[in-house]
């Protein structure tokens, strides 16, 4: 399972290849080999997308995954290169816990989560995976958690207060 940077295609997006798996379908005449690729694409400023591609050849699978990731991009509200608040994400048997970290802490996360944070533009975060560490589940759980992030303006609107009241600066 190789981890690569495939930088830029001219559109300013960072592409990360998280993993390539060889899969086999057993049929009457023998085995049919194919490949599946998992990728994330980010703009370095809160935009992130995930894609999975399958093909009989690795480059085609990777290209399909990159294209799907570009089509599935979402915007996550960040604050000074870290998260707005601590958040938990779940997918399948995977639970991820992510919390903001002070400036200079760096990305304290392993495996597939580190690739997601690099692509999205988070520079200071502490994260932990509980349960299954399958890369696909970890990426999905991370994105599910990131999509739960609320900005102070969102919370103020829900409560009918001002942002200053929410932040405690009165």
Swiss-Prot record:
Pfam families (alphabetical): Ribosomal_S5, Ribosomal_S5_C
Domain S5 DRBM, first and last residues per copy: 13-76
GO MF annotation: an example: structural constituent of ribosome
GO BP terms in the entry: translation
GO cellular component, one term: small ribosomal subunit
Disulphide-bridged cysteine pairs: none
Keyword list, A-Z: Ribonucleoprotein, Ribosomal protein, RNA-binding, rRNA-binding
Membrane-spanning parts: none
Family recorded in the similarity comment: Belongs to the universal ribosomal protein uS5 family.
Domain note: The N-terminal domain interacts with the head of the 30S subunit; the C-terminal domain interacts with the body and contacts protein S4. The interaction surface between S4 and S5 is involved in control of translational fidelity.
PANTHER family attached to this UniProt entry: MITOCHONDRIAL RIBOSOMAL PROTEIN S5 (PTHR48277:SF1)
Function: With S4 and S12 plays an important role in translational accuracy. Located at the back of the 30S subunit body where it stabilizes the conformation of the head with respect to the body.
Name recorded for this polypeptide: Small ribosomal subunit protein uS5
Source species: Laribacter hongkongensis (strain HLHK9)
């Amino acid at each position: 399972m190789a981890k690569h940077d495939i930088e830029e295609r001219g559109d300013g997006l960072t592409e990360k290849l998280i993993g390539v798996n060889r899969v086999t379908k057993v049929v009457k005449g023998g085995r049919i080999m194919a490949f599946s690729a998992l990728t994330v694409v980010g703009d370095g400023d809160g935009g992130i997308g995930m894609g999975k591609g399958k093909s009989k050849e690795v480059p085609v699978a990777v290209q399909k995954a990159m294209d799907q990731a570009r089509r599935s991009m979402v915007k996550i509200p960040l604050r000074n290169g870290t998260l707005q608040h601590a958040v938990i994400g779940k997918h399948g048997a995977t639970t991820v816990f992510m919390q903001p970290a002070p400036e200079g802490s760096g990305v304290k996360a392993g495996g597939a989560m580190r690739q997601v944070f690099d692509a999205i533009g988070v520079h200071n975060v502490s994260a932990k995976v509980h349960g299954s560490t399958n890369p696909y589940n970890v990426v999905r759980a991370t994105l599910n958690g990131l999509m739960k992030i609320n900005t102070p303006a969102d919370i103020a609107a829900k409560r009918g207060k001002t942002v200053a009241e929410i932040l405690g600066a009165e």
